[in-house]
Structures are given as C-alpha cells and as structure tokens.
Design a protein with these regions (language model features):
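Internal helix-turn-beta structural module
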Residues: 304-347
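Gly-rich Lys/Arg/Thr-decorated short loops/hinges at beta-loop-alpha junctions or inter-strand turns
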Residues: 19-27, 223-235, 318
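N- or domain-start disorder-to-order transition segments that initiate the globular core
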Residues: 8-47
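Acidic (Asp/Glu)-rich catalytic clusters
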Residues: 47-50, 80-84, 130-137, 222-223, ...
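Conserved phosphate/anionic-ligand binding catalytic regions in large, soluble enzymes, centered on
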Residues: 55-68, 326
Length: 351
C-alpha cells in the first residue's frame, strides 16, 4: 500500500501574484528611485561615520489603514525638511507583524482585518503606499519577516529591520546579505547581544541559498554580503538604552570587529511596553547624544496620529489613526521628540 505522505496539513492553496507582475502594475518612478537611492546613501554615510546626522525611524507600529499612513506622511514631510541638517528621518512602514502566539499578522497577510487573508490585495496595498510615499520624497523603513515578500517591495525600501525573534534565523541573515538597503538587527528578546553581533557578521559575508525570482521561479541566489548592517538595542528582560548598556554593546561590537554604530529602539522592552515611556527613553538617549556619544547613530520611535492602541472588535468602529498592534505616542509628542533629538545633534557637534 502506498501511503499519502505529503500536504497532510494543507487545507487550501491559492496562487499569489508574481513579483514582476506587481512591479508592472506599480512601477517605480524616477522620483521614487531618487528618494530611495539618496536615503540609502545618507544612511550608509551615517553608518560609516562620514555623516554626524542621526537616523530616525519613526511611524506607526504597523500600517492597517493606508489613508492614515498617507496622512502621517504628510505631517512628517515638512518636519523632515526643517530638521534635515541634523536628522535623517525615515518613516516606519511595517506591513508584517511577528506574533508571540497568534494574532493579526499585518496588512500584507490580512488587509481587510477579517481573517480573509487576501494576500494579493495586501501586496498591492503595500506597494502602492510605498510608491506614493517615496514619490513624496519620504524614505520608508520596514521589517523583513517573510522571506518572499521582499521581492515585491524591497526596491522601494530605504532601510530594513530584522526583528528580535528572527535575528538568529539563518534565512534572515542570508536575506540581509543580499538586500540593497542598510539593515538593523535587534538584540534577542531576552536582551542578549551576541545573536545580533553574530547576525551582523554573518550578513556582511557572501551567501548562496535558494529563493524565488521576480518571475516566481525557484533559483539559486548568490549575494555579495551587506556591509551596512548594524545593531538595534530594543531591551530584553530589562531596558538597555542607558549609557552603561550602550557602552557594553559598543564594546561587544568592537571586540568582534563589527561597526560600533548602533540604533536604540525607544519602544518594546526599552519602554517596558508602556508607550508613554518612549518619551523618557528618547530624552535619555538625546542626553547621551548631547554629551558627545558618537556611537548612537539612530533612534526608533513608534508613533501614530492618535496615542495608544485599540483592539479590532468591529473594524467599522475603529478609531482613525490609532494603532491596532503596539501602543504609539501621538503626533504632537513625536514632533517635540524629533526637535529634541535635532537639538542634541547640534550640541554634539559643538561639544
């Protein structure tokens, strides 16, 4: 007797649009490519110590409403121009959410917020939003969680993150080694730094692995390695944004021969999951910068139009501009923090 041994737990199968088809639907424009190219160049210069500007990744924890995302971008644009001498501002545009157990996995996976999982529509929404925002002159930063989705959107992404749960993943290190943008690796959820140090080292080297082409075919990819990778301190069992922890992380990076420039995530475990504490964390980091710390090259903030968060109980009754994942600070608080960071950079220059 021949037993069935494959697909025993697969309940459905639906074809997804090939990446090159989505690229034809939403082709990158000259203006968008200029935004991405110049932002990547600016971030490279910050990472290599050629620029003393501060990289700031700021925006909603996740995008669930593209209209609100576009409104946020419109608020951010004039501030980007005003603070451009001190800050390189990149809008946080996260479409994929890692879950500790289960939950909404992001706009690409479930754009309608109703477990219909219309991924084709989610991919279209994601690329359309990235294209519009890049056309406005605003660079985007995103987390790379799924290993296939970068083929759909990575040409429109100026900075990428690998999250705490995936930093140790070989597949994500290989992906980062071939991405065209700078990439930040978060420390482990328990606060351990070694996994991020190892990830930076691994991603800087060439790799050969299997993946999918833009035509949707399996292929063997060879990468050159990504020298624009850095650590993101996001806290662990305790916060790790303070000067002592920054010094420890810098020393560990230096000992392993890695770039000592690092970013501090003001949210997550550093804020102890209290969005209002981002203000305190960011103020502390600004103080370190003001005091002359040149190893802090970036800051990450979770910010939205409206403070706090909400559950998706009835999607027709959602508060416009408020997060449905992690709680965020409001726009007015964000604006004040960005100005504080810019002043800290000015003070560091004068020190």
């Amino acid at each position: 007797m021949k037993y069935k041994t494959d697909d025993l737990r697969i309940s459905g199968l639906q074809e997804v649009i090939p990446p090159d088809e989505l690229h034809r639907e939403f082709p990158i424009t000259d203006a968008a490519s200029d935004t991405v190219y110049m932002a990547r160049k600016a971030i490279h210069e910050i990472l290599q110590g050629e620029s003393d500007r501060l990289l700031v990744i700021v925006g909603p924890c996740s995008i669930h409403d593209t209209k609100a995302g576009r409104e946020y971008a419109n608020l951010l644009k004039p501030l980007m121009a005003e603070l451009a001498d001190e800050l390189c501002i990149v809008m946080r545009i996260y479409f994929e959410k890692p879950r500790t157990t289960v939950g909404w996995k992001g706009l690409i996976n479930d754009p309608h917020l109703d477990d219909s999982f219309n991924i084709n529509h989610g991919l279209r929404q994601a690329r359309s939003l990235l294209l519009d925002i890049a056309d406005m002159g605003i660079p985007a930063g995103t987390e790379y969680l799924d290993l296939i989705s970068p083929q759909y959107i990575s040409d429109l992404v100026s900075w990428g993150a690998i999250g705490a749960r995936t930093t140790e993943s070989q597949g994500h290190r290989e992906l980062a080694s071939g991405l065209s943008c700078p990439v930040g690796f978060k420390n482990a959820t328990d606060g351990g730094l070694k996994v991020a140090v190892d990830a930076i080292q691994a991603a800087s080297r060439p790799h050969v692995f299997m993946s999918l082409t833009k035509q949707g075919h399996s292929a063997i990819f060879s990468t050159t390695g990504n020298k624009d990778c850095h650590m993101i301190l996001r806290g662990g069992k305790t916060p790790n944004y303070d000067a002592a922890n920054v010094a420890q992380a810098t020393q560990q990076l230096e000992s392993s021969g890695q770039n000592t420039h690092l970013m501090i995530d003001c949210s997550h475990a550093n804020s102890e999951k209290d969005h209002t504490r981002q203000i305190q964390v960011c103020s502390d980091v600004a103080g370190q910068i003001k005091a002359g710390n040149h190893n802090i090259m970036g800051v990450m903030l979770e910010s939205h139009l409206v403070a706090g968060r909400q559950n998706v109980e009835n999607k027709d009754e959602l508060i416009y501009g408020q997060s449905i994942t992690d709680a965020c600070i409001a726009w007015d608080e964000t604006e004040a923090l960005l100005r504080k960071l810019a002043q800290a950079v000015k003070a560091r220059r004068e020190a």
